[in-house]
Amino acid sequence: MNVFVLTFFICIIYLLFDLIKKNKKLKDEPPTPKLALPLIGHLYLLGDRPNRSFLELSKRYGGIFKIWMGEYPTVVLTDPDHVNEVWCKQFLNFTNRPHFNSLDQFSSGFRNLSFSDYPLWSELRKLVSSSFTKSKVKGISNLLETQTNYLINTMNNYSINNKPFNPKKYIHKLTLNVVCMIAFSKEIKNDEDVNEGDMARLTKPKEMILKHLGSSNFCDFVPLVRPLFYLKNKRFDQTLKQVREYIKEIYDDHLLNLDLNSPPKDIMDLLIMSTNDSKEDIIIQTCIDFLIAGSDTVGVTIEWFLVYISNNPIIQEKCFNELFNAFSNSNNTDNNNNNSTITTAIGFGDEYSSKTPFLNACIKEVLRIKPVTSLGLPRIANDDTFVNGYRIPKGTQIIENIYGLSNSDQLIDDPTTFNPYRWLEYQKLKSFQNDLKQQQQQQQQQQQQQQQLQLQQEQQEQEQQKINLEFNNNNNNNNNNNNNNSNNKHKYYNDLDKISIPFSTGRRGCVGVQLGEAELYIVCANLVYNFKIESWDGKKINELEDFGIIIHPSSHNLKITKRNNK
């Protein structure tokens, strides 16, 4: 009995000290919500969509605030200046990831590109980044077009048969194939059903891994309760084992057929050659990175694109008309049979995208309103430091609130409305300001060249003053428009390039940005060009995201109608 009483009192004392520790205010620390509870800290404030909870907290406590996520002090950044300070200026102090148990399991001891520490991360990044340059991505345009062909012909069959089309598995088959070909030259056959073969072998484990990593695992933040999650973590290990075995088979095949005298044909070859086959586990884990993250981020963004153009038919028609006017001479249909085979009419590159500014704006707006990695991947402070005057102790977890940056009404006008036109207006304003700056620079150069001629110099000065006055008036007009009916707007208000960073920023940003942009453009352009896309039941599709490490739309069916592009 005395043992139970002693244990009870020890628990009470521990909880009391934990309560005091978490609620003690430190000098120069960021603003903090009032009550952090023992063990769980502020986790009770986050709900089932932490991205939205962090957005609301940022409105109350500002662009940098501190919370306790269980036992981990955490600083959340929802301000471009703070993000730039941590992700770019103080990069070396914030290079590493937190060592949570679930991340340890997934990365086999932090031995992959996503979660490894410096300097291993730096070595891996240098190796793989060469595979994602603009020229390399341009070189795989045939692969992207081929996979898009498969998708649009599948959709055409649904259109012909007037059946509801659930896009998720088919889109993810496309993006998975692209990643598999680039990473290890393996293709899921076009005639292979999405519920069979490699798709079936990979899809479910991939979904389970993403769900586990994105579920804000309680035992990650409160290690004391980890034994209670033994069975859940064991199932996670078993799921990871399935994926590792799949990649290991491919790895063994690469070793068997590797030609050291020829250039590497894919990322796995590149890693094997660069490490002399001495880091098998790291190679396998890095390829799992590409398999899971590389396919799902793009695939889910395409899903969101279809949701928003379905819910906004006027915008969809404007996209189609733009594409039709630009590419209607492309012969993309083979009418030799009743089930006309479609081929991609639109590829990737400046020669295509330069003709479709409105479609480009639609894709950017999807990335703004639904950045699929809504909270990015966390970092940790390696040493004590200050961020714009706020003290950040060593070991503090840092979260980049990507969703909050692009969806806060303190940073952007009407953030919850899908409005591609905002990007067109923004580009016009940027172009106008750049032209004025160039004009000023030219005038200054002319002044320097003609200083010996007093009369010409005076004329130049008068012209310069006039240009400066016009420039200031234009800026004042723009500021007045932006500040109508509101006070104290953020200095980056409606500065879309500053607040919309769906691929993150800095040296540890997404390595596959070029590939992702190419996939998004080719797929979205060809789908809108070939089909009218609506919700199956005629109702608006739910735009509320399901939270995870990747935020995705709820399951839905689409009505696909083939367009007549002749």
Curated annotation (Swiss-Prot):
Disulphide linkage map: none
GO cellular component terms listed in the entry, alphabetical order: membrane
Binding site for heme: 510
PROSITE patterns in alphabetical order: CYTOCHROME_P450
Alphabetically ordered keywords of this record: Heme, Iron, Membrane, Metal-binding, Monooxygenase, Oxidoreductase, Transmembrane, Transmembrane helix
UniProt-listed Pfam families: p450 (PF00067)
Topology versus the membrane: Single-pass membrane protein
Record-linked SUPFAM superfamilies: Cytochrome P450
PANTHER family in alphabetical order: CYTOCHROME P450 307A1-RELATED, HEME-BINDING MONOOXYGENASE FAMILY
Protein name: Probable cytochrome P450 519D1
Species per Swiss-Prot/TrEMBL record: Dictyostelium discoideum
Gene expressing this chain: cyp519D1
